[in-house]
Amino acid sequence: MDIKTALSRIVGHLDLSTAEMSDVMREIMTGQCTDAQIGAFMMAMRMKSESIDEIVGAVSVMRELADKVELKTLDGVVDVVGTGGDGANIFNVSTASSFVVAAAGCTVAKHGNRAVSGKSGSADLLEAAGIYLNLTPVQVARCIDNVGIGFMFAQSHHGAMKHAAGPRKDLGLRTLFNMLGPLTNPAGVKHQVVGVFSQALCRPLAEVLQRMGSKHVLVVHSKDGLDEFSLAAPTFVAELKNDQITEYWVEPEDLGMKSQSLHGLAVESPAASLELIRDALGRRKTENGQKAAEMIVLNAGAALYAADHAYSLKEGVALAHDALHTGLAREKLEELGAFTAVFKMENEG
C-alpha cells in the first residue's frame, strides 16, 4: 500500500493492517515520500489514533532498517527509556538510573537522543559529561562488554528517520514517531522500563512489545504526569512478564520510599542536570541532590526488576539503593567517558 492510498483510508477513520503500515513506513523511510505527504500522514494518524497493529508495523520497519548492535547475549540486558514530552523538565532520571543499574551488576544497553521538547535529552547530558556519542555499533558493543553500559545515539542508528525529520520539526506536535524511539532499541533488548507521556499509552505499548517478543517490560506513567516513576505521586504500570500483561498502581511507600515533592529537580540545561546527577551519585551534599538520588533509586530499582535481577520492584529498589551508596554508579559514569575517549581518537584522529 502506498502513502496516498493509506491517507485516504486513515482520513476515513479506517485502520491499516500491520503489513499495510509496514509498506507505508518503508516508503517514508527510504525517501520515496514528499514532506507534505509525511506531514499529512502523521497528522491523520494522530487524529484517528494509532492502532496496535499500526504501531507494530511501524516498529518492525524501524528495527529492520536500524544499524544494529550485536551483543553476545540479551539475557538480563536492560534499557531505561522514555518518550519524553512530559513537560516537567526534571533532570535526566532514566539516564542517571542506568548507571546505578550498571553499578548493581546488570548490563545496560541505553538508547536515547537529544531533547525534543525538554531542556536536556540523554544525549545532551552524556555529551556534557564528556562521553563521546558518535560510536559505531561495534564500539557500542565493546562499551557494553567492558563497562557494563553503552549508549546508542538514536540518530546514529536510525539514519532512515532523517526523511521524517523535517515534517516532524515543522509540525511541532507529538506524533507516532514520538512513540517509536523507546520501541526500537538497536540492540534488540527484551527487558525495559519504558516511560510514556500519557497513561493511555501504557497498555497499548505493552501489547506492542509483547508482539515484538519482549520478555519483561514495565510501561509507566505517573499521576503527576512524568514518563517515569515519581516520588510525588502514584505511578501507573502496565507490566509484561511471562507473556502476560498486568496493570496496577504503585505508591513510593509500597517500595520502601518516602513520598515527597519534586521541587528542586527541574533543570534548565544539560550542565545543570549533570551537576545535580553528580551530586546525587556522589556525596549528596545538597537537599536536592539527596532527593534526586531517591528518584534515581526508584527508577533504577524498576529497571533491576525488569531485567530479572530482582524478584520484585521492592527488592529492586533496595538493590539500587545499595548500588548508589557504594559510589560505583558515579565511577561507571566516568569510566564510560574514558572508554569512549579512546574511540573518539580512533574515529577522529
Swiss-Prot record:
Q: Name one GO molecular function term.
A: magnesium ion binding
State the superkingdom: Bacteria
Residues that hold anthranilate 1 according to the record: 82, 113
The residues that hold anthranilate 2 are: 168
Q: Specify which residues bind Mg(2+) 2 according to the UniProt entry for this protein.
A: 227-228
Q: Which reaction does it catalyse?
A: N-(5-phospho-beta-D-ribosyl)anthranilate + diphosphate = 5-phospho-alpha-D-ribose 1-diphosphate + anthranilate
Q: Enzyme class, one word?
A: transferase
| GO BP of this protein | L-tryptophan biosynthetic process
Identify the residues that bind 5-phospho-alpha-D-ribose 1-diphosphate. Answer: 82, 85-86, 92-95, 110-118, 122
Q: How is the cofactor bound, in the record's words? A: Binds 2 magnesium ions per monomer.
Which residues participate in Mg(2+) 1 binding? Answer: 94, 228
Q: Give Gene Ontology CC terms.
A: cytosol
Instruction: Enumerate the cofactors the protein uses.
Output: Mg(2+)
What are the protein's UniProt keywords? Amino-acid biosynthesis, Aromatic amino acid biosynthesis, Glycosyltransferase, Magnesium, Metal-binding, Transferase, Tryptophan biosynthesis
Quick one: which pathway?
A: Amino-acid biosynthesis; L-tryptophan biosynthesis; L-tryptophan from chorismate: step 2/5
Cross-referenced InterPro entries, in alphabetical order? Anthranilate_Pribosyl_Tfrase (IPR005940), Glycosyl_Trfase_fam3 (IPR000312), Glycosyl_Trfase_fam3_N_dom (IPR017459), Glycosyl_Trfase_fam3_N_dom_sf (IPR036320), Nuc_phospho_transferase (IPR035902)
This enzyme's EC code(s)? 2.4.2.18
What role is this protein assigned?
Catalyzes the transfer of the phosphoribosyl group of 5-phosphorylribose-1-pyrophosphate (PRPP) to anthranilate to yield N-(5'-phosphoribosyl)-anthranilate (PRA).
Q: How does it assemble?
A: Homodimer.
Protein family per UniProt: Belongs to the anthranilate phosphoribosyltransferase family.
Name of the protein: Anthranilate phosphoribosyltransferase
Species this protein is from: Pseudomonas fluorescens (strain SBW25)
Tell me the organism's taxonomic lineage: Bacteria, Pseudomonadati, Pseudomonadota, Gammaproteobacteria, Pseudomonadales
